[in-house]
Design a protein with these regions (language model features):
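Helicase-associated low-complexity/disordered flanking segments
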Residues: 1-72, 127-130, 171-184, 188, ...
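Membrane-integral, polyisoprenol-dependent glycosyltransferases
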Residues: 55, 79, 158-159
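Pre-Walker A (Motif I) flank of P-loop NTPase domains
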Residues: 68-74, 99-101, 153-154
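Conserved SF1/SF2 helicase motif Ia
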Residues: 75-80, 85-116, 123-128
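Conserved helix/coil segment N-terminal to the catalytic DExD/H
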Residues: 87, 95, 116, 136-178, ...
Length: 195
């Protein structure tokens, strides 16, 4: 429930500061791991996201293409782990190169769900996840843009409309190294003039 989620959030200034200090400490540990053992880091991230299950060959292939810096279109059946591949790559970029990623989703409900799960899963690595949609207040937008610029935000989840309107602001932060359009088949299903 929302009450349970809010109960776990830090409330006092001291709690917020302690949380941020722990995030920075975790981040430093995993950045060292990225420099010393990138394959080990990738395994740790995969384990955090899916446990002990092995990757499918198609997932390994997508990750190899992304690692090589290739633009990649991944078409897989539902439940075959497309999201896992780009989430792993984004986490690796954040820790190894301090690059941020933008994930574009067709629905705000999907953004909310993914943001919750990604934040919960990746916080142990010191990776920060934010949301920018048409529902974001001007202050929230300014804060996320500032965090993108200063390196304290690593992954932004947004909608096609927000991206189209604010792409220049996102680009000006200078840290975007990876962009993903999830559920891209919805683009062709939208009304004329949209998406």
């Amino acid at each position: 429930s929302d009450d349970e989620l809010c109960a776990d959030a830090p409330h006092s200034t001291e709690e917020v500061e302690a949380y941020e200090a722990a995030r920075i400490e975790n981040r430093a540990f995993w950045e060292r791991k990225a420099a010393e053992d990138p394959q080990g880091l990738e395994s740790e991230i995969i384990h955090a996201l899916i446990g002990d299950r092995p990757l499918h060959p198609s997932q390994r292939e997508v990750l190899e293409h992304l690692r090589a810096g290739r633009n990649t279109l991944a078409v897989m059946a539902t439940g075959r782990g497309k999201s896992l591949t780009f989430q792993v790559h984004a986490a690796l970029l954040a820790l190894a190169q301090r690059k941020a990623s933008v994930f574009v989703y067709p629905l705000r409900a999907l953004i909310a769900d993914q943001a919750f799960h990604l934040s919960e899963t990746l916080e142990g690595f010191g990776i920060a996840v934010s949301v920018l949609t048409g529902e974001s207040t001007p202050e929230e937008r300014r804060q996320v843009m500032a965090e993108l610029t200063d390196g304290s935000c690593d992954i932004v989840l947004t909608t096609p409309e927000f991206l189209a309107y604010h792409a220049d602001k996102l680009a000006r932060c200078g840290r975007i190294g990876f962009a993903v359009i999830d559920e891209a088949h919805h683009i062709g299903l939208a009304k004329a003039g949209q998406r």
